[in-house]
Amino acid sequence: MLEGCILAGSRQIESTTNNSVPGAPNRISFAKLREPLEVPGLLDVQTESFEWLIGAEDWFQRAVDRGDVDPKGGLQEVLEELSPIEDFSGSMSLSFSDPRFDEVKAPVDECKDKDMTYAAPLFVTAEFINNNTGEIKSQTVFMGDFPMMTEKGTFIINGTERVVVSQLVRSPGVYFDESIDKSTEKTLHSVKVIPGRGAWLEFDVDKRDTVGVRIDRKRRQPVTVLLKALGWTNEQIVERFGFSEIMMSTLEKDNTAGTDEALLDIYRKLRPGEPPTKESAQTLLENLFFKEKRYDLARVGRYKVNKKLGLNVGQPITSSTLTEEDVVATIEYLVRLHQGDQTMTAPGGSEVPVEVDDIDHFGNRRLRTVGELIQNQIRVGLSRMERVVRERMTTQDVEAITPQTLINIRPVVAAIKEFFGTSQLSQFMDQNNPLSGLTHKRRLSALGPGGLSRERAGLEVRDVHSSHYGRMCPIETPEGPNIGLIGSLSVYARVNPFGFIETPYRKVVDGVVSDQIDYLTADEEDRHVVAQANSPLDGDGRFEEERVLVRRKGGEVEFVSASEVDYMDVSPRQMVSVATAMIPFLEHDDANRALMGANMQRQAVPLVRSEAPLVGTGMELRAAIDAGDVVVTDKAGVVEEVSADYITVMADDGTRHTYRMRKFARSNHGTCANQRPIVDAGQRVETGQVLADGPCTENGEMALGKNLLVAIMPWEGHNYEDAIILSNRLVEEDVLTSIHIEEHEIDARDTKLGAEEITRDIPNVSDEVLADLDERGIIRIGAEVRDGDILVGKVTPKGETELTPEERLLRAIFGEKAREVRDTSLKVPHGESGKVIGIRVFSREDDDELPAGVNELVRVYVAQKRKISDGDKLAGRHGNKGVIGKILPVEDMPFLPDGTPVDIILNTHGVPRRMNIGQILETHLGWVAKAGWNIRLASDGADGSTEVPAWAAKLPEHMLSAPADSIVATPVFDGAQEGELQGLLGATLPNRDGETMVNSDGKAVLFDGRSGEPFPYPVTVGYMYILKLHHLVDDKIHARSTGPYSMITQQPLGGKAQFGGQRFGEMECWAMQAYGAAYTLQELLTIKSDDTVGRVKVYEAIVKGENIPEPGIPESFKVLLKELQSLCLNVEVLSSDGAAIEMRDGDDEDLERAAANLGINLSRNESASVEDLA
């Protein structure tokens, strides 16, 4: 499989980043190193794989230019594999070729709006050949609608945006393993030949020193039986393996004489109970390993086998089945490995090293990207179709057959649909913010069909491996059961034609580092000596030091002379993923906390006003642009018109381009996706320039949170255990306010009793409730709604009612039916509120496509403005997370000497044991960036000299001063040094009163807002970037008075989604018993839970102001009796005088009478949907 060539373009990093994107903000960078390679397209892993699948022109051109890759698309490959389909006699055949696509049926936005799939019709040329007459019939055949990838690397399936995650699997090939026998403590060796498709072949040396073989995981046999079955004589075996004692002893123990006996022996093991014949045994063995239909090593497997065993190296790959030479070379390799040889002479004469394989090495694990996953699914669909075609060939008249009559496309369409709809690797896209979407597309999963399972995966496969360097991020992985099984592609990594991940290195020749970029797989890297990116170089690219720190195979680190170095890293951030590369001062954070920081950035919600970080890493711009949520110019020109909804650009070639904005759209996760222009009419724009910001972006840079003035100190114990204290200013000024949009949907269907109707005419509802509904019964845009309010009025027929004889006579004469309807309106779910911002109505009358039986569909969008509140979760980028414990009035917050109150107070205890010191350094640099600096001014001597201090000697001229509110970048592993930080803190600009607030140690004297007294010790103060996470208290807080009950036990349901109650469990009952609170306990176990009669009577007593009646028998007790009776145990309940009490299954009459009198229904059972509960 091909991932296109990424050309290495050289670029000099000056001390500002973002130079490669026109109009980008000028971020002052502390980077010391030059990066010779631009960050590649971050979505290439998705887009290029899909281009390979459909054989897109761009991909085809790249493949032809590259030369070492078969320029054949994935669909073409599958069709060639399938063709020709022949009937059982071989007299007819059907071939497929030339897959091509028509235009997509509808644009992306329309597909999302109307719940359609973004797809294009696929056509192939089908050729039917009658081999008897030589007649050829050719037709263009429609093969179904094929889901297409959007520009952002996603798929729209039934209106929802989905991502296909790349899968990490063990590569087909030959794997040698070593183990210790527990009884004899001997070293045993084994080898597995793993195909892409087909039976496994395993060889091993056991503790008795015999070489055995297992075919298709069946019983073990001497390996010489297999060799004889392949036609080898004893003499040939001795000639090839005479050097090995264990092979000779195996041959002696083998009782089979000749090929025929060996074949029959194998057949008996594989097909026990079936009568063996020489022909059937020969056919079985050939089918198992030597027929392409049954056995497929895949191109990658053939490549790996050739490389391992030294066969046909450098020759083009033609066959993908096993050969006799493969089997023999594998056995020889195993034997030599067991006897301790270091090398083996391959049949071609080359020497290959003899060693065991590490299955967790990235040379043995490959990536199945989108294109290959879909290709495999199409292969499954086509093989099902093949059976149908064969059957139809035999049943239809030869003269009347055309390709169209033979082909049934249903299996193919169903296979594609099944993959996108239900596969573990086709996932609902994470759209919390642009970074979460980008990371989702770059995710690598070891789970899924053909992969590992959570339960089976051990520690080794989850662990960080030296071969991950530059390929998979060692930091970013989920916490919990999936840790280590799901990873993220490193920034510079790409995927090669065989699916192995490659990473770029700079070529070093005789100690001189060149700008030539070579992409190496993990196998190739093991053969070289690699220096790190920050090894000091002189002006000619030579290493400054004689001894250079390098790494060798297995991640071993040592010092070697400069002439021994083969390659050098291209960038210090080469090993990490995009999210991890956005953590400033990552090098000062513990890995566990950095993991949390990388993961929590993906949970940040877009705020009403986005703000880019004062302290960034230089990765923000590329991440935001490649995520695809900003609007970028296609052609350079001049902005002609700007409005909130669109931007028109007159291009230099005279064409006019209109770019539309997404306005307050709902993302998959209910966050608000809104785009707003950042250019003005008349402004000149270049190709690739950002025209409009999206959610979580500012001036085209990723902006996930806010820069807040932070004080790191304890405050009256209110920020104990990671609690956070906030200033009320953040609430009043909507600094941390986010907009959340919920979609509510209702449809009007045909029922057995008649059609449902969307109407304003709802029975038993007052006019006040209907005030905001229009004449159709749909709420107006702009209406404020609370839980329980009607959004769309709907009535459902209830069926005929009992009529008096007189009414029946009238109905018979006039033909009218007494229709009764019940209210099934769409209401705002419990605990939600907001403002109606959009309504979409789809109707069969307007020729909209609707599911069968649905006449009308209404969608209502309700937006909620959520201010920050107690209980919301905030986090920094270093894994420093906490819940808001208290929001203080501004006047009570600690303040700086000039009267500036801080925004947020974090506890000091959250830093030392978590070892994420990056947050402290970020706070210091944040203050420096906000205040601005002038190094010359600070070092001004008494004699008026303005010499630059030693710590600033390496800084370029324009970094010696910066105005207030500057933005800076400190790239990972190449950022601001501690000495620079300390110097800059001493060189910050004074405020308008001429005072510097923060000392050179980063601390300031703070004053208590309540008393005005200074705190006894100076406090660390600065600006930290704080994210508001999606764990909002409004989504979690919940209370219930009456609600639904479980059908069997009649106890209240649990959880907010079910509008459930709080469980009073076994241990809580013990606590009540311990305190002797008998009546409280009785209440909890009966009338507050499952005493069906008692709870209605209690409600009645409360309404009428009477005393609470005695509790009855709880339903769960009756369930217990039934369960005991079902075990044939006769259980009776006796009264105090010993008489048996009759247990009724439910005092239904009392219950119904009481409920009817009160006009309530307390005994709501489990309901089908949450809407019914409100």
Curated annotation (Swiss-Prot):
One of its GO terms (molecular function) is ribonucleoside binding. Pfam families: RNA_pol_Rpb2_1, RNA_pol_Rpb2_2, RNA_pol_Rpb2_3, RNA_pol_Rpb2_45, RNA_pol_Rpb2_6, RNA_pol_Rpb2_7. Keywords: DNA-directed RNA polymerase, Nucleotidyltransferase, Transcription, Transferase. Its EC number is 2.7.7.6. Coiled coil: none annotated. It catalyses: RNA(n) + a ribonucleoside 5'-triphosphate = RNA(n+1) + diphosphate. GO terms for biological process: DNA-templated transcription. The keyword Membrane does not apply. The keyword Nucleotidyltransferase applies. Gene3D superfamilies: 2.40.50.100, 2.40.50.150, 3.90.1100.10, DNA-directed RNA polymerase, beta subunit, external 1 domain, DNA-directed RNA polymerase, subunit 2, domain 6, RNA polymerase alpha subunit dimerisation domain, RNA polymerase Rpb2, domain 2. InterPro entries: DNA-dir_RNA_pol_bsu_ext_1_sf, DNA-dir_RNA_pol_bsu_external_1, DNA-dir_RNA_pol_su2, DNA-dir_RNAP_su2_dom, DNA-dir_RNAP_su2_hyb_sf, RNA_pol_bsu_bac, RNA_pol_bsu_CS, RNA_pol_bsu_protrusion. One of its GO terms (cellular component) is DNA-directed RNA polymerase complex. Belongs to the RNA polymerase beta chain family. The RNAP catalytic core consists of 2 alpha, 1 beta, 1 beta' and 1 omega subunit. When a sigma factor is associated with the core the holoenzyme is formed, which can initiate transcription. DNA-dependent RNA polymerase catalyzes the transcription of DNA into RNA using the four ribonucleoside triphosphates as substrates. This is DNA-directed RNA polymerase subunit beta. It comes from Mycolicibacterium gilvum (strain PYR-GCK) (Mycobacterium gilvum (strain PYR-GCK)).
